[in-house]
Amino acid sequence: MLALIQRVTRASVTVDDQIVGQIGPGLLALIGVEPGDSDAQIRRLAERLLSYRVFGDDAGKMNRSLADTGGGLLLVSQFTLAADTSSGNRPGFSTAAPPLEAEPAFNRLAAICREKHRGGVETGRFGAHMVVDLVNDGPVTFLLRP
């Protein structure tokens, strides 16, 4: 499992012209599920999403986490994130978990984050064509693995 996180001033996800998830200041996390991702890996990634320090303290140093700021978390499933791009000019998707494995893993991640984070957790819609709108703050972007 991997997450491409972006510090945002706002972000939203739209499906069929309806906003299905939106946050103000916080993190947008694009989530790629890989075959065999364990519950321990899912829990560890949730912990990292909530405790990774990407927000500025009073001195402007990245010393505050999402848990510290109480900002929003927008989770968006993105199977292309787990693609194999090591050769050729076309991605391969054998390194991404199939939907029947990926959807429960993504939902588990969202449930853990909701349980642990007071700042609000929103999601896109698994398997749907989504339009993601965001304002990246910084820009600040990191790739996290459990």
Curated annotation (Swiss-Prot):
Q: Name one GO cellular component term.
A: cytoplasm
Instruction: Outline what the protein does.
Output: An aminoacyl-tRNA editing enzyme that deacylates mischarged D-aminoacyl-tRNAs. Also deacylates mischarged glycyl-tRNA(Ala), protecting cells against glycine mischarging by AlaRS. Acts via tRNA-based rather than protein-based catalysis; rejects L-amino acids rather than detecting D-amino acids in the active site. By recycling D-aminoacyl-tRNA to D-amino acids and free tRNA molecules, this enzyme counteracts the toxicity associated with the formation of D-aminoacyl-tRNA entities in vivo and helps enforce protein L-homochirality.
> What InterPro entries does the entry give?
Daa-tRNA_deacyls_DTD (IPR003732), DTD-like_sf (IPR023509)
Keywords assigned? Cytoplasm, Hydrolase, RNA-binding, tRNA-binding
- Name a single GO biological process: D-amino acid catabolic process
Instruction: Pinpoint motif Gly-cisPro motif, important for rejection of L-amino acids by residue range.
Output: 138-139
**Subunit details for this protein?**
Homodimer.
> Which family is this sequence assigned to?
Belongs to the DTD family.
Q: What is this protein called?
A: D-aminoacyl-tRNA deacylase
